[in-house]
A protein has these predicted regions:
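Short Gly/Pro-enriched turn/cap motifs at secondary-structure boundaries
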Residues: 35, 68-69
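Residue-level detector of transmembrane insertion/anchoring sites
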Residues: 45, 65-66
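Conserved short histidine dyad/triad with adjacent acidic residue
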Residues: 60-63
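Conserved beta-strand in the GNAT
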Residues: 55-57
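Vicinal oxygen chelate
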Residues: 12-16, 69-93
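Core-facing hydrophobic residues within beta-strands of well-ordered domains
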Residues: 2-5, 74
Length: 93
């Protein structure tokens, strides 16, 4: 049976901005980065505590997600943290 979540895949609208946010601001480790020429897109694998992964995908002109929370697709991604106040302070810098 299922033991845990292995990874979450997210299609991003701005690859470089998202790469910076997840790797620099959140401090996730870049495991692999690939440019897929045939799709003109990037795939970035990020490690979360060496246990889980977040995959960021970029595509040229991806369709925007509807602005309704009930729309199909990833609704949100939640992280557990040691100290919420410290994390909020860090993110606001």
């Amino acid at each position: 049976m299922l033991k845990s979540i292995h990874h979450v895949a997210i299609i991003v609208s701005d690859y470089e901005k998202s790469k910076h946010f997840y790797s620099v601001i959140l401090g996730l480790k870049i495991v692999a980065e690939h440019f897929r020429k045939e799709r003109n897109s990037y795939k970035l694998d990020l490690a979360v505590n060496e246990v889980y992964q977040i995959e960021l995908f970029s595509f040229p002109s991806p369709p925007l997600r509807l602005s309704f929370p009930e729309a199909t697709g990833l609704r949100h991604l939640a992280f557990s943290v040691e100290n919420l106040e410290e994390v909020l302070k860090h993110l606001k810098k």
